[in-house]
Amino acid sequence: MDASIELNAKAYCKIMLHCLKHLTSDCYGLLLGKKEKNKYIVNDAIPLSHDKIFGPPFKIAISMIKNYFPNEKIIGFYENLIVNQMKEEGAVSNQAHYICEIIGKNNKFESLFFQIYSKDSGEKGKPFLKDEIFFKEFILNDENIFSFVDNKKETNEEFQQMKDYCIHNRQQDIIDFDEHLENPNLDWRNTFVN
């Protein structure tokens, strides 16, 4: 597969902040963007949960995302499993596979999956350190098979600035959809991240 993925700084930062805030929990979220030929452009990320994803809250989140972001498509899913449940390098959880399959069917094109991990992801509660967080990017094709996308990005000033921003404790400000359901006054869109 000759596809590429462009992850903008806002989406990158939201994913990082979500994982940093919930160091001892699994984190899940959705990727918003578009597909242009063989290029996937991820414009935003919506943190969903720092626990398990359940049907009714997930459906409410999807409905609200479609309402607040009418010009964006849900093109993928991200997950950070703190307890290393992966059986082998690059394995994808059943939950991620199922959600990506639904996203792909709804869009009529392949969906993205970002697996977030640190060098020591098996150590529950170990704080993420700068330059120790990694993304593995996959595309679920129409044959229901995940393909790894080697999408090495040169470190540029914008991403370095966002990484530094994440490391300076702004993670306490990120709100996932679970937290919004507990307190509707909280901003699940995380508009403070630009």
Residue ranges and their predicted role:
Residues 1-75, 80-194:
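MPN/JAMM (Mov34/JAB) isopeptidase/deubiquitinase module and associated MPN-bearing subunits/adaptors
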